[in-house]
Amino acid sequence: MKALLFGGTFDPPHAGHMNNLRAAMQAVQPDVVLVMPAGIPPHKRASATPGELRLAMCECFKALGPQVQVSQWEVDRAGRSYTYNTVSMLQEKYPGAQLYMTIGSDMLETFDEWYRWREILAMVTLVVQSREPGDGDALRAAAQKLEEAGGKIMFADAPVLECASSDIRAGTVSYTHLTLPTKLEV
């Protein structure tokens, strides 16, 4: 069985997220996809948007297929959300499964700074998506470094959609062509 973890703050989710998840699903062909909004990420401040609302917004990802589930595990967990803890939980929940985890290219380049990163590499295959056009050389160098440390890395080709949740929240840029079409009733 293949399980794909797609984590993020998702505050709010947007078409760029949908695009990246679609590409990762095409590359991996997973049996189950776990969309997991972060509780309190270690590299960011806690989201001002309540976890319950972000979970509800993430229901839109289910449009990509019946294998997509939204997990509240990190939102419900006390304290900071470390990827190591999440992946360890998934190993227990899906014993024997091949675990895949999507990350953006910016995260690949700093992955060796993550909490217990070597152990994460031993548990998952990283599915990397580029966020910037033309960052191929830097990505290949970062991937090679992690592969030398025992990591398994694959790239999911997706058109780059320049869109950021922070800009949507701030209202500084109009992303109406990249926001999701479904309105959420809460």
Predicted regions mapped to residue ranges:
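N-terminal catalytic cores of NTP/NDP-binding nucleotidyl/phosphoryl-transfer enzymes
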Residues: 1-29, 33-39
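Residues at the starts of beta-strands that form the adenosine-phosphate
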Residues: 31-33, 98, 125
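N-terminal Rossmann-like or analogous alpha/beta NTP/dinucleotide-binding catalytic cores
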Residues: 39-123
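A short helix-to-beta-strand connector/capping loop
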Residues: 65-68, 148-153
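Short, flexible loop segments at boundaries between secondary-structure elements
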Residues: 124-138, 154-161
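Short, aromatic/basic amphipathic alpha-helical patches
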Residues: 138-147
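Conserved small/polar residues in nucleotide/adenosyl-binding loops
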Residues: 176-182
